[in-house]
Amino acid sequence: MTISNKSWRSYFPHLRKLPEDDQYLYSDDTNSSIIAEEELHHSVDKSSKTDVTAETTAVEPHPHNLRHDLPYEVRDEAGRKWWKYFDEFEYRVNKEYKKSRKWYEFLYPNHTTQTKAERRLLYKLDIIIALYFFMLCWSKSVDLNNYTNAYVSNMKEDLNMKGNDYVYTSTIANVGAIVFQLPFMYLLPRFPSHIILPVMDLGWTWFTFACYRANSLAELRAYRFILSAFGAAYYPVSQYILGCWYAPDEINSRVCLFFCGQQLGSVTSGLLQSRIFKSLNGVHGLAGWRWMFLIDAIAISLPTAIIGFFVIPGVPSKCYSLFLTDEEIRIARARNKRNQIKDGVDKSKLAPLWSRKLWKKVFCTPAFWVLVVFDTCSWNNMTAYSGSYTLWLKSNTKYSIAQVNNLSVIPACLGFAYVIFCAFGADLFRCKWIFMVFAAIMNTVSCALLIKWDIPSKAKWYAFFTTYFSVAASPCLWSFINDFLRFDPQVKAITWIAIYSFSQSTYAWIPTLAWPTVESPRFKTGYTVSLIFGAIYGLWTFVVLFFYKRNEKKHALGNGIILYDSNKGEELPEFVKKNMEERDGYYYLKRSS
């Protein structure tokens, strides 16, 4: 049913059933029994029962799991150069894709199977998904940063906050987010995201509103705990959805919008708090910081929740979108098949959450632990969100409260440029790791300067202005996680939540030890901890790259690459000789196959 239908269902999100759904959806992932694994040196995911090209034409799958619409590169691994280790897409795409891709089309990468219809789909996705998550992250960031701005705008004095009360309150809020993420291991693959996120956002809105009436520290902590519990879903669920719609060389720039929303929240929170404090402080007997919580809830968070219900599309295999046509849904599914992204599993085929086999698939995979370390380092090297810069400004008596709020937005404004540089650069050059290492280097230099502290004023301002490099490469990190986990939706949901919960749990207690408010404004311990995690983050990038390359090599056939190594006495696989023909340097299935 399309939006042109005038029944009531046309105006509310509903499951879009296509005629071929009974055949398309939820095929099992099994390895082909025809091609031996040792011959190919990779595992092959079983294709679903019908294939849809970008032209939305059905093609019967080949019994060897080879596709009629894909040119294959036969690659002899003999003599492989050492520097190929640093080629992130070595096994992710074949040379035909690399040649057809024009550098200036990195936002909408060119491929011979792409059509104008596919580009139109991407334009729509950028509007209804990427921009919505930009708005969602902005909404959340405004509130999270509002806590810091409220603290320096007399909330500290009004609620009699002393010593480390500021950081302890943040820790309590983090605990709420961590604990209430865990149920989404069960909910995410089973319930539509266009219901999950808006419902959680409504809870977030209510308790943001409640913060305005907090009359004691204990009351504020209770509200922040419950508020964070309702915000537990939006990070992992949003990334889960983005990973189901975008290809690996498209997703960095879209996740970039998510993080730009975060930076915009930092900017607008400071500016709004400054303006509200100046204009509304004392109006109707309410302090300026209380007005900010009221405005945040009613004018920002509530509209975001309502809009989300209508624009979040679900995933291609279970699409609820009002704005995508049937043909665009088919194209999205074909793109996922082309990129080996499995986005849906029938509920009846989901393993029970307590299944030992399921948890073994999660925890006994080396990539899980590699990504846990990676994300933990990412969380704990974040000087950008420590509040240290704002507290340093407040400690300088020459700045008024309004000036502190205005100046506090400068690093976040620069953060826009840093995030865009890393994310768009990663898509442009198809190379995430180099931008992650660069950001880690910049962050460690910033931390080193702030550890020394007694440095020229210009050097200190430079150090504070580069703190947002600690989050600049986060889109690249999350894109790595999405690409690692694209083969199994249930494992992806559990792994995303597990990685995120573990990493965030360390962020619940490490900042308490590393950034005690009593050390303000110098925070020598905090900058030292951030430097250590930042250095490990940069070095660990190469470990992640190793496991990523190993994983993609196993799935090279699905990416259009047939591998063998003549140095090991291997020959061209027999199925290539029997079932394929060479044309213009590539191998295609014979038309009779």
Curated annotation (Swiss-Prot):
Domain of life: Eukaryota
Key words of the record: Biotin, Cell membrane, Membrane, Phosphoprotein, Symport, Transmembrane, Transmembrane helix, Transport
Extracellular side: 1-121, 188-190, 246-291, 383-408, 454-460, 514-526
Subcellular location: Cell membrane
Chief place where the protein resides: membrane
Modification type Phosphoserine: residues: 32-33, 43
A Gene Ontology BP annotation from the UniProt entry: biotin transport
InterPro entries: MFS, MFS_trans_sf
Pfam families listed in its UniProt record: MFS_1
Transmembrane regions listed in the UniProt entry: 122-142, 167-187, 191-211, 225-245, 292-312, 362-382, 409-429, 433-453, 461-481, 493-513, 527-547
Gene3D superfamilies the UniProt entry points to: MFS general substrate transporter like domains
Membrane topology: Multi-pass membrane protein
Stated family: Belongs to the major facilitator superfamily. Allantoate permease family.
Function in brief: Involved in uptake of biotin with the concomitant entry of protons.
Protein name: Vitamin H transporter
